[in-house]
Design a protein with these regions (language model features):
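PP2C/PPM-type serine/threonine phosphatase catalytic domain
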Residues: 1-282
Length: 282
């Protein structure tokens, strides 16, 4: 089978900052990347190391898939490409792990009987079959709930609005501490310019017939079915097909504009970058 690419959407969370998401889709594959918000000075040329790793990763994964690589081989080669590019172009070597560029990823590749999904972090794949059955791939919903709980707790402890946390040194140090545990033995692994990250990707094989709708998205878009509870995950796929991604993007931003401090819906950013691809298996 192949993908019919129906719709695409990618919205920056802040018009004054780079969009640190990336997405590409063709008949043979679809991928979204969500660059992790930088917490140190950039090491690469350009405004954002997070935007670099997301865009580079998306391009290289898709390029290797076009060369008929298997999904795992394409990922392995893309990570090796990223390691070489980072080593060659960076201003200096990272001193601590929080200085590395990281990204979440969801890669979907169609098969004769459904699709393969490979992922890091908190991007999501939602699938609705013609008979109405539903699958959710990844841990994004659970991670969004945990982040909302953390935002509410941090705001209470510091007597600040949740969306003000990013401006505090206390929060920055917490994030750096968490990042220093990434891509290490026993820790969480994300897409990064480290070839060995290919050994730690999550994988699922999903059986689905032609006519199934597939929504691949970053957690910023998934907030409609997580933080803001506007839709169930399954209903979000239906809304994408019936209303369109542009309309859903407008709904997302309207909710955030109505709660700029994150008090009704606790979160660390007023608006996150939000990216989605709507596909159909054919």
């Amino acid at each position: 089978m192949h993908f019919d690419v129906l719709q695409r959407l990618s919205l920056a969370g802040d018009a004054m900052k780079p969009n640190e998401d990336a997405a590409l889709a063709e008949a043979n594959a679809a991928v979204v990347f969500d660059g992790a918000t930088p917490v140190s000075e950039p090491l690469m040329p350009g405004r954002s190391d997070a935007a670099w790793i997301a865009q580079f990763g998306a391009r290289r994964v898709m390029a290797h898939l076009k060369e008929a690589d298997t999904p795992r081989a394409a990922l392995r080669h893309a990570l090796a490409d990223a390691e070489r590019s980072f080593t060659g172009l960076r201003r200096r070597a990272p001193r601590q792990r929080h200085e590395w560029p990281y990204a979440s990823m969801m890669l979907a590749v169609p098969r004769d009987d459904g699709l393969d999904a490979l992922w890091y972090g908190d991007c999501a794949l939602l699938l609705v079959r013609p008979d109405g059955s539903f699958d959710s791939i990844g841990q994004a919903i659970a991670k969004k709930a945990l982040e909302a709980s953390d935002a509410a707790r941090f705001a209470k402890a510091t007597n600040t609005a949740p969306t003000g946390a990013l401006d505090t040194m206390q929060f920055l140090e917490l994030i750096r501490s968490a990042r220093n545990k990434l891509n290490a033995t026993g820790g969480t692994w994300l897409f990064a310019p480290m070839a060995k990250a290919s050994e730690h990707v999550s994988h699922a094989r999903v059986a689905a017939p032609a006519g199934s709708f597939v929504l691949v998205c970053t957690d910023g878009f998934l907030a409609l079915a997580g933080d803001y509870r506007s839709y169930t995950p399954k209903a979000l796929v239906g809304a994408a097909a019936s209303k369109g991604l542009v309309t859903l993007g407008a709904e997302l931003r309207a909710l955030e504009d109505g709660d700029p401090e994150g008090r009704a819906f606790p979160r660390f950013k007023k608006s996150d970058d939000a990216t989605a691809l709507l596909l159909r298996l054919a």
